[in-house]
């Protein structure tokens, strides 16, 4: 078992690496269901790496290995191979190759059964390790070594397995169900192949496969993006899969004792592990794209019903797409010039009536998307985030914001508005004396863009909201209040839109705005503008990156229409009436993908996979008829995260088709004149 109490205190007796304790005398595996690693739900932060919990992995003591020279080359190894050191390479004695030889020597000393488990057990004699005992004793407070064990919620109690020196020729697939494992020792066996299911162990930080008969590694090895140590000493490996380029956290790759090809060997000898991994990543070929996402038809109604398609996508702006955030992505796939073309291609292929993009900077909107999408009959509305105000023009180009596009031949733009959550909050009458509004909310410059559209042909009107909320999980209260302010402002706008005058001359709008006016001869006469009795009767789409998972406070407020003032996400902070009397809104909103139980994810990276993006709609005015489905599951077995060559952002696009329900507005009765009784 692992224990955190004495980490770093137990150097292995043979001079090997310092370990956290684990024991092999375990009556049964403990359930992984209690293992809840902390994750950060957004790409701006979830790539921060944790610091090492132990000292340098290979601290040599004054024991036998301390006297071993870098040229330690035993005449015979377990698999019959001999040390493969090119003495004629001048660089062979640099620091990188010296480390290889040192680690290889250590590995060859560890060929006995359960070497690492036994060494740790020997080192920890007299120190109480969390004992195997009935569950009822787990929360005891008395420890034999005199320390006091604090009560805590159940957790995974061990994280390492040592199957070293067992003569294993194959591995049971059940081994790879222990996805909580952080260390796995399979060294000095007789394995000739590694199962593809190794890719399931995505928490592995240390994997030792030394002293086997491996000739290759599966592509799925690239899924182990938490790996820091990968030991392959003394196998028969000649080449490495390009997918190892995904292992951006790998510090040490042990390959001495393998007939590795000259190009790869030269990279690691001269420049070390990081350089080799970078080489594999940058030289990675573009694999076949996944199958197209299924178009899931939910309601195959008559084509005569008014239909509207809506697409929402967080595009991942250039300033956020850094190699420090996305170290697993090849630089050419991370470049904005490449990714923007992928985004544009997807938008054109779906040809949605309405498109909502988040994280689009001003330069990309004005210099690329607006120009390119104009060829596809799109008109756009854009606002940058609040920080752009007061900046020099050139600097402001890099500030991202929200861009909403709509088909100019189908819709008339009646109004457009921008909601700055922080500025709106401080203008509220009840904001006075509420420090949290100023200290936590006002400093965040996130926005929503609102457009009010009318269908030229049918007269139906639509409110389209495009929002991007704050990401940090430590600011749940901020996300909740941003959502509450968003709903308040939409309520006010919708009430005004219900009183909006009708369009009196749609033909003029059509000829002046629509491309290819000559086609208008075949268009039916447009219907009059539809009237609505109240704001909540106008069809509403609310799209965006809400940075909130299903079941969160922000999600529940949108879905349920109300939230208590005592919600724990508020953390007893003061936000005026919003924290005193609670939050409400009048709309009957549903998530479009709620019809299929939501997608598996909308944001996909090695450390985070969750649902953050939504297309909300008012269920009293609209009905979901079709959706763009999941990303192919088989494709994801070899892809640890987005963006990549096929997906331009860490978020995926949401795309849905809606049917407009029957009119809910004012009913105008026809006058047939005097009637006979």
From Swiss-Prot:
Record keywords, A-Z: Cytoplasm, Exonuclease, Hydrolase, Leucine-rich repeat, Magnesium, Metal-binding, Nuclease, Nucleus, Repeat, RNA-binding, Transcription, Transcription regulation
Annotated stretches, region: Disordered: 30-49, 128-155
SUPFAM superfamilies according to UniProt: DNase I-like (SSF56219), L domain-like (SSF52058)
PROSITE patterns from the UniProt entry: LRR
A UniProt-annotated Pfam family: LRR_14
GO molecular function per UniProt: metal ion binding; poly(A)-specific ribonuclease activity; RNA binding
Annotated localization: Cytoplasm; Nucleus
GO BP annotations, alphabetical order: DNA replication; DNA replication checkpoint signaling; nuclear-transcribed mRNA poly(A) tail shortening; positive regulation of transcription elongation by RNA polymerase II; transcription elongation by RNA polymerase II; traversing start control point of mitotic cell cycle
SMART domains on file: LRR_TYP
Entry's family note: Belongs to the CCR4/nocturin family.
Name the record gives this protein: CCR4-Not complex 3'-5'-exoribonuclease subunit Ccr4
Organism lineage: Eukaryota, Fungi, Dikarya, Ascomycota, Pezizomycotina
Gene symbol of the encoding locus: ccr4
């Amino acid at each position: 078992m692992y224990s955190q109490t004495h980490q770093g205190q137990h150097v292995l007796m043979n001079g090997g690496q310092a370990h956290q304790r684990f024991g092999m005398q375990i009556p049964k595996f403990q359930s992984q269901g209690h293992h809840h690693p902390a994750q950060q739900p957004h790409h701006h932060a979830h790539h921060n790496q944790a610091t090492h919990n132990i000292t340098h992995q290979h601290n040599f003591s004054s024991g036998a290995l301390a006297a071993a020279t870098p040229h330690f080359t035993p005449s015979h190894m377990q698999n019959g191979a001999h040390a493969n050191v090119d003495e004629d390479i001048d660089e062979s004695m640099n620091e990188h190759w010296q480390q290889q030889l040192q680690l290889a020597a250590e590995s060859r000393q560890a060929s006995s059964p359960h070497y690492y488990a036994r060494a740790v057990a020997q080192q920890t004699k007299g120190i109480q390790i969390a004992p195997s005992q009935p569950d009822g004793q787990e929360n005891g407070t008395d420890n034999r070594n005199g320390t006091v064990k604090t009560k805590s919620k159940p957790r995974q109690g061990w994280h390492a397995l040592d199957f070293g020196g067992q003569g294993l020729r194959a591995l049971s697939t059940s081994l790879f169900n222990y996805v909580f494992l952080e260390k796995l020792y399979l060294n000095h066996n007789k394995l000739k192949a590694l199962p593809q299911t190794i890719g399931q162990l995505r928490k592995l930080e240390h994997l030792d496969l030394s002293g086997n008969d491996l000739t290759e590694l599966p592509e799925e090895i690239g899924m182990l993006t938490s790996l820091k140590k990968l030991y392959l000493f003394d196998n028969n490996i000649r080449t490495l899969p390009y997918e190892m380029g995904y292992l951006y956290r790998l510090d040490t790759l042990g390959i001495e004792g393998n007939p590795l090809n000259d190009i790869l060997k030269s990279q690691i000898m001269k420049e070390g592990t990081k350089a080799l991994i970078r080489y594999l990543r940058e030289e990675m070929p573009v694999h076949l794209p996944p199958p197209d996402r299924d178009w899931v038809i939910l309601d195959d109604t008559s084509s005569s019903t008014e239909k509207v398609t809506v697409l929402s996508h967080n595009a991942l702006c250039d300033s956020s797409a850094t190699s420090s955030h996305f170290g697993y992505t090849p630089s050419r796939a991370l470049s904005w010039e490449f990714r923007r073309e992928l985004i544009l291609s997807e938008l054109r292929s779906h040809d949605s009536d309405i498109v909502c993009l988040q994280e689009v900077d001003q330069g990309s909107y004005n210099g690329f998307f607006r120009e390119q999408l104009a060829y596809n009959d799109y008109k756009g509305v854009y606002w940058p985030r609040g920080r752009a105000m007061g900046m020099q023009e050139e600097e402001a180009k890099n500030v991202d914001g929200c861009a909403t596009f709509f088909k100019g031949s189908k819709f008339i733009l009646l109004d457009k508005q921008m909601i700055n959550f922080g500025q709106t909050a401080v203008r509220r009458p009840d904001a006075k004396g509420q420090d949290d509004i100023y200290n936590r909310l006002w400093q965040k410059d996130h926005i929503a863009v609102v457009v009010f559209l009318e269908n030229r042909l049918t007269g139906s009107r639509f409110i389209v909201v495009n929002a991007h909320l704050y990401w940090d999980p430590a600011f749940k209260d901020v996300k909740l209040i941003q959502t509450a302010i968003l709903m308040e402002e939409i309520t006010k706008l919708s009430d005004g839109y219900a009183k909006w005058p009708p369009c009196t001359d749609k033909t003029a709008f059509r000829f002046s705005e629509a491309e290819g006016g000559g086609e208008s001869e075949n268009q039916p006469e447009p219907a009059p503008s539809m009237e609505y009795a109240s704001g909540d009767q106008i069809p509403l789409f609310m799209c965006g990156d809400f940075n909130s998972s299903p079941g969160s406070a922000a999600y529940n407020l949108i879905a349920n229409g109300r939230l208590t003032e005592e919600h724990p996400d508020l953390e007893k902070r003061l936000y005026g009436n919003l924290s005193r009397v609670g939050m409400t809104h009048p709309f009957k909103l549903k998530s479009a993908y709620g019809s299929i139980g939501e997608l598996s994810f909308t944001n996909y990276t090695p450390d985070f996979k969750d649902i953050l993006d939504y297309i909300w709609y008012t269920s009293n005015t609209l009905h979901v008829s079709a959706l763009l489905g999941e990303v192919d599951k088989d494709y994801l077995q070899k892809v640890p995260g987005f963006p990549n060559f096929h997906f331009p952002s860490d978020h995926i696009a949401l795309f849905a088709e809606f049917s407009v329900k029957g009119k809910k507005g004012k009913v105008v009765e026809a006058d047939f004149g005097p009637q006979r009784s």
